[in-house]
């Protein structure tokens, strides 16, 4: 009889910690529920689902805004390199020319030629387009950084979305047009002036055109991402 009592006592002592932990967990859950109800007494299961949905939506929205920020940084850098290289493209070459007149058999003179980007309308067009894209991208980067920090829009997000899509598409078309015209001018210069020693100017012009085309691609991609943000999150 004593052994049975001892075994039952041992089993009771083993079960007591389990029951105690369950009671503690139940008390913790009750306290949490009371705190939630105190914070929002009208909270229901439907409201909780809405909150969770909005939270997941905001996380996706932040990811798209981060992607847009990265694209705008690339556009900013490409435009900066494009107009910086084009603005520095200057060269002076000496071209040998043979002259013949009635009193001599002919002689050779060296005529200096100076190459400056602002002497061609195509290069001026490309320079202006990249400067505009550079300034616009810088302003957009500042705005996106401010939004990611504060999570607040400075203006109506729908209105801003329409503005972003319109300006991104416009600048993409302008950069494509400017890059194409500058590439044509550089190709025409290469056909004649490359053999006369103007290779440095032509190479810098081609490098600027390449960066301008990359800036066009960045703005086209930014327009696409801005449209996705406008359609899905505003």
From Swiss-Prot:
Glycosylation-annotated residues: 98, 206
GO cellular component, one term: plasma membrane
Identification of the protein by name: CASP-like protein N24
Region (Disordered): 1-24
Topological domain ranges for the Extracellular compartment: 87-128, 190-210
Transmembrane segments annotated in the record for this chain: 66-86, 129-149, 170-189, 211-231
Lineage summary: Eukaryota, Viridiplantae, Streptophyta, Embryophyta, Tracheophyta
Name of the gene this protein is made from: N24
Subunit and interaction comment: Homodimer and heterodimers.
Inducing factors: During Rhizobium meliloti-mediated root nodulation.
Family according to the record: Belongs to the Casparian strip membrane proteins (CASP) family.
Originating species: Medicago truncatula
Membrane topology term: Multi-pass membrane protein
Keywords carried by this UniProt record: Cell membrane, Glycoprotein, Membrane, Transmembrane, Transmembrane helix
Basic and acidic residues: bias regions: 11-21
Cross-referenced Pfam families: CASP_dom
């Amino acid at each position: 009889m004593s052994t049975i009592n001892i075994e039952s006592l041992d089993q009771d002592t083993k079960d007591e910690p389990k029951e105690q932990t369950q009671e503690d967990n139940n008390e913790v859950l009750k306290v949490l529920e009371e705190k939630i109800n105190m914070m929002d007494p009208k909270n229901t299961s439907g409201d909780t689902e809405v909150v969770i949905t909005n939270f997941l939506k905001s996380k996706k929205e932040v990811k798209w805004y981060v992607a847009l920020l990265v694209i705008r940084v690339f556009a900013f850098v490409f435009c900066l390199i494009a107009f910086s290289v084009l603005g520095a493209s200057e060269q002076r070459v000496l071209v040998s020319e043979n002259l013949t007149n009635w009193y001599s058999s002919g002689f050779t003179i060296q005529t200096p030629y100076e190459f400056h980007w602002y002497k061609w309308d195509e290069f001026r067009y490309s320079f202006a387009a990249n400067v505009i894209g550079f300034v616009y991208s810088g302003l957009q980067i500042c705005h996106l950084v401010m939004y990611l920090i504060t999570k607040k829009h400075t203006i109506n997000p729908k209105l801003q979305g329409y503005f972003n899509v319109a300006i991104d598409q416009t600048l993409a078309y302008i950069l494509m047009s400017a890059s194409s015209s500058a590439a044509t001018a550089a190709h025409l210069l290469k056909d004649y002036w490359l053999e006369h020693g103007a290779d440095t100017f032509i190479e810098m012009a081609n490098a600027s055109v390449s960066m301008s085309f990359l800036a066009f691609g960045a703005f086209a991609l930014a327009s696409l991402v801005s449209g996705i943000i406008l359609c899905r999150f505003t």
